[in-house]
Amino acid sequence: MNETNDNDIDQLIYLFSKLPGLGIRSARRIALYLLQDKDVRLKSLINNLVEIDKKIVKCEICGNMDTENICRICSSEYRDKSIIAIVETVAELWAMERSGNFKGLYHVFGHNLSAASRQNPSILRLPELLTRCFAENIKEVIIATNSTLEGQTTAYFITEYLKEHPAKISRLASGIPIGGELDYLDDGTVSAAINLRQPFE
């Protein structure tokens, strides 16, 4: 095998190793699995990724990922449209959906605030959130940011920003450890946190 091919395979392994939860050893196994039957496995993966890239878009309302400009959650007539949960990323939205215990709407920030990195609060899409709260007559805002320092910082900033809106503001409750991230918790823990949410002050 020539040097160019070696470099190409190394690049493939490197790309896989950058995926969440994968290290170099796992990346090597995946690359080898695909390359051993590339006409079926690798081409199938490539074709599916191309199709996903064409079809998946960000919801214009909440920031969720879907195949429609307005996602299935926002367009559903069965959701409680008086409650909105604020999450950092789509991963946290999926975690709450898996719990089967939240029937409201979502607002995905896509980021959190870090005092250390001095991020601009404009990354949080707060004006859009406030507009939604007034336009959709939201009665309760659940702050479902992670229990990390950044998540807590973001939660306090949201609370201050929403002071002009009369909605009740609550925070996910017991079951989420300090420093814990929502996406890594089991479904029962997420469900308990939703049920036992508390006013956020």
UniProtKB/Swiss-Prot annotation:
SMART domains: TOPRIM. Pfam families: RecR_C, RecR_HhH, RecR_ZnF, Toprim_4. InterPro entries: DNA_Rcmb_RecR (IPR000093), Rcmb_RecR (IPR023627), Rcmb_RecR_Znf (IPR015967), TOPRIM_dom (IPR006171), TOPRIM_RecR (IPR034137). This is Recombination protein RecR. PROSITE patterns: RECR (PS01300), TOPRIM (PS50880). NCBIfam families: recR. Keywords: DNA damage, DNA recombination, DNA repair, Metal-binding, Zinc, Zinc-finger. One of its GO terms (molecular function) is zinc ion binding. CDD domains: TOPRIM_recR (cd01025). Gene3D superfamilies: 3.40.1360.10, RecR Domain 1. Belongs to the RecR family. A zinc finger (C4-type) spans 59-74. It comes from the Bacteria. It comes from Rickettsia peacockii (strain Rustic). Residues 82-177 form the Toprim domain. GO terms for biological process: DNA recombination; DNA repair. May play a role in DNA repair. It seems to be involved in an RecBC-independent recombinational process of DNA repair. It may act with RecF and RecO.
